[in-house]
Design a protein with these regions (language model features):
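Buried hydrophobic residues that stabilize the cores of well-folded domains
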Residues: 1-267
Length: 267
């Protein structure tokens, strides 16, 4: 069984304190695939309740680019997410306002790198208390994007719809994400304002540990365009410590390989 909170989101077993990720592209030379330079990707720090409290992000050169912090109240409800550059300058922030029961009533996002852009979100809930809509809008009141959530009769999230609005507030794109009973994404697709498919659909498969093992994308004619297959090495806890990602396009035979390493430290 997985733990609660962010341990479950990352399919982590055991009381993980740190998760360090490194990545390496593989190059094909002399009849075999060999790793190129390995570089750090990101690091997650969890508190003893299994919630992410700090995140380090690294750029393509392996240099630290962002430092993230997440803060919670005494009951574990999220209150603030901040990302700063290595010098301490603010890059972005998310401020959460909740009611007495911990239900989110408003969220304010500030993008501080480049032009300062502020957006607010006010979610809407059904009678059972489940979030059914989240509308984001700019300071002048124009709409930015809207999320719509649909649930199974048993209560699990079944589908998330994302509508992105153009400058005239017409729908520019619609993204559909479908989930299985375990909360795993099993299908994604993107449609233009006329309802035509412009990305995907892509289907996903998982192993018994909740790790993604395959992603298959169809082209606009319905044929198979590409596949991405994932294989894993596991530690004694059942957590993956190495993931090999193999991407192939069907028509051209183009192939890329990426290895991701995950070093875990436990409480």
């Amino acid at each position: 069984m997985t733990n609660g909170n962010h341990w479950a989101k990352h399919h982590l077993r055991g009381r993980v304190k740190y998760a360090h990720f490194d990545v390496a592209d593989l190059e094909y030379h002399s009849g075999r695939w060999a790793e190129d330079h390995r570089r750090p990707l990101n690091t997650l720090m969890f508190n003893e309740a299994g919630r992410v409290i700090k995140e380090l992000l690294f750029d393509c050169s392996g240099c630290l680019s962002q430092v993230g912090f997440k803060r919670y109240d005494d009951r574990g409800h999220k209150r603030e997410t901040l990302f700063r550059n290595p010098r301490g300058g603010l890059l972005s922030s998310l401020i959460y306002k909740c009611d007495e029961a911990g239900k989110l009533v408003e969220c304010e996002h500030t993008q501080a790198h480049g032009l300062i852009i502020k957006q607010r979100c006010r979610p809407r809930y059904d009678r059972a208390g489940k979030k059914v809509e989240a509308l984001w809008f700019f300071e002048d009141g124009t709409r930015s994007r809207k999320y719509v959530y649909r649930y199974r009769l048993t209560g699990e999230l079944a589908q998330e719809l994302l509508y992105k609005f153009a400058d005239d507030e017409s729908i520019e794109e619609k993204w559909s994400t479908i989930y299985d009973e375990n909360g795993n994404v099993v299908e994604t697709a993107c449609f233009d304002r006329e309802g035509r498919t412009i990305a995907g659909p892509t289907w996903y498969k998982y192993d018994d540990y909740g790790n993604k093992v395959e992603a298959a994308t169809r082209d606009l004619k319905g044929g198979l365009y590409s596949t991405t297959c994932y294989s894993y090495d596991l530690d004694p806890q059942g957590n993956w410590i190495k993931r090999l990602e193999v991407f192939k396009t069907m028509n051209s035979g183009f192939e890329t390989r990426v290895a991701t390493y995950r070093r875990l430290e436990y409480y």
